[in-house]
Amino acid sequence: MKKLFLFFTLIFTAFAANSGLFDKKQTFLKVDDAFAFSATLSTDKSQLQAHWDIADGYYLYQDKISAELVGKSNPLSLHTQQAAELHQDPYFGEVKVFTHSIDGIFRGTFNNADDKVEITYQGCTEGFCYPPETKVLRIGDLAVSQEQIVEKTVEKNTALLSEQDRLADGLFHSKWAIFGFFVLGLGLAFTPCVLPMLPLLSAIVIGQQQRPNMMRAFSLAFLYVQGMALTYTLLGLAVAAIGLPFQIALQHPYVMIGLSILFVVLALSMFGLFTIQLPNSLQNKLNTWSQKQTSGAFGGAFAMGMIAGLVASPCTSAPLSGALLYVAQSGDLFTGAVTLYLLALGMGVPLMLITLFGNKILPKSGEWMNTVKQTFGFVMLALPVFLLSRILPEVWESRLWAGLATVFFIWFALQMSKNGFGYAIKIISFALAMVTVQPLQNWIWQTQTTTQSAVENMPVSQVKFKQIKNTEELDRTLAENPHSIAMLDLYADWCVACKEFEKLTFSDPQVQQQFQNILLLQVNMTKNSPENKALMERFNVMGLPTILFFDQQNNEIKGSRVTGFMDADAFSNWIEKLL
């Protein structure tokens, strides 16, 4: 019995030992369990957002992750939020790998539901390496994510929030914030896009045959501002709904030339060459309300205000961008319309006050009124120069201003008497005419030196931007960025504030010093090409100027976007926060 017991004990011990040997055989997870993959689309369909959940002890090779649209040769580059780690791999040597979950994006245009994206990746674990894994995804089958990964950024920049974002957030959190836009409009009244509206309003109120009383002057100014506010509001909503192509269409050379001709005709009428008026039959019906569609008529004031809204609308500012951003994101057209209206109304109030008080301090009606009217005719001629400067080379802008100033000073000198103080003013006016005519002399007689000619054709800022033509070139350039951040300037020839950036901000020595640590990129949006449209849709650009900043992972830095003009000091401080 003892021998039998010993026999069975030895048998079970042997099986137990063998069982332990089998237990030492290592088991590995299936590839979908080791690297659980999922993908979604961004709301604007410009990003395919990929996510991998990596099991403990496993890792993905960074350089083995790739993607492309099936049937198209261009690969899609991956931008990840997480930094890869260095790893000594027994198969590939020292490589960069991901050992935890990955959130990344493939940028492109994913509007066609039938398109397919092929994503390939490969990973390993200790003692075992998986073959490359390929996923083929149909665009139409992907869910849409409500969050864009591109908006995330590194920790040091989370405190940044651009002014337009703060304003848009304010509208989301409190509808009472719309009244703050009226105050912001007061400040915008003194920007280069709105100030040219002052002479037009002054010409309407003051430049008429008889000096208006205070009530009539207020009514004219008020109607002018209402016309401007109405146009500004409607165009703002159109830009928010349609996008930058609508804004660019308003800046087409045909539109600029047409408006310029209109202002020239109005200016000539102020010189008394002719009178613009409605047919007699219609005048009798409308009576005094629209007896003359020249300066001083209520209908003319409102119409000129609407035209002024066209002139001012292309200039993008932070308050305007904030309102447009709110409309685009919320779809709340009513709040957006009220916000834009109050912004435009704030812009018009200072113009009204300046015009009203200017009208009040003038002496009573007399012969001087004709001189004042003709003076405002010259002022109105400045508006075509302002408009044409958006589409003409910079050298022609200076020639047009020189010609207008020269003619004005000669005319003004001829108005002065030959006695006493008037004679002194006459001499000074002729002297000023001789100074202002110099650019025209240089042009006609070709007396410019080689240096002057070179300066005319050289960008004012002398900052060297790498020109970008499309999204693919942008992605490649960002991937090769040797600096900590990259800056993308969206520019157009018709954009007045863009030229201000070039002349006043980018030329600043402090800003240029900071630019040495930044990859400088620029896209010319003047022609609104298909490539321009793709960039505009990808980054949800509301207007120009717009400047974007990207981090080392080639993602746009949240809250860093600049829209509207920013002076050198403010821009330098802004960059300092990013570096």
UniProtKB/Swiss-Prot annotation:
CDD domains on file: DsbDgamma (cd02953)
Catalytic reaction list: [protein]-dithiol + NAD(+) = [protein]-disulfide + NADH + H(+); [protein]-dithiol + NADP(+) = [protein]-disulfide + NADPH + H(+)
Keyword Cytoplasm belongs to the record: no
EC number assigned by the record: 1.8.1.8
Single GO MF annotation: protein-disulfide reductase [NAD(P)H] activity
Transmembrane segments: 178-198, 230-250, 254-274, 296-316, 337-357, 376-396, 397-417, 420-440
GO CC annotations, alphabetized: plasma membrane
Gene3D superfamilies noted in UniProt: Glutaredoxin, Thiol:disulfide interchange protein DsbD, N-terminal domain
Keyword terms of this UniProt record: Cell inner membrane, Cell membrane, Cytochrome c-type biogenesis, Disulfide bond, Electron transport, Membrane, NAD, Oxidoreductase, Redox-active center, Signal, Transmembrane, Transmembrane helix, Transport
Signal peptide span: 1-16
Principal subcellular localisation of the protein: membrane
Biological process terms in GO annotation: cell redox homeostasis; cytochrome complex assembly
Pfam families documented for this protein: DsbD_N, DsbD_TM, Thioredoxin_2
HAMAP family assigned to the protein according to its UniProt record, in alphabetical order: DbsD
Family assignment from sequence similarity: Belongs to the thioredoxin family. DsbD subfamily.
Function of the protein: Required to facilitate the formation of correct disulfide bonds in some periplasmic proteins and for the assembly of the periplasmic c-type cytochromes. Acts by transferring electrons from cytoplasmic thioredoxin to the periplasm. This transfer involves a cascade of disulfide bond formation and reduction steps.
UniProt-recorded name of the protein: Thiol:disulfide interchange protein DsbD
Classification lineage: Bacteria, Pseudomonadati, Pseudomonadota, Gammaproteobacteria, Pasteurellales
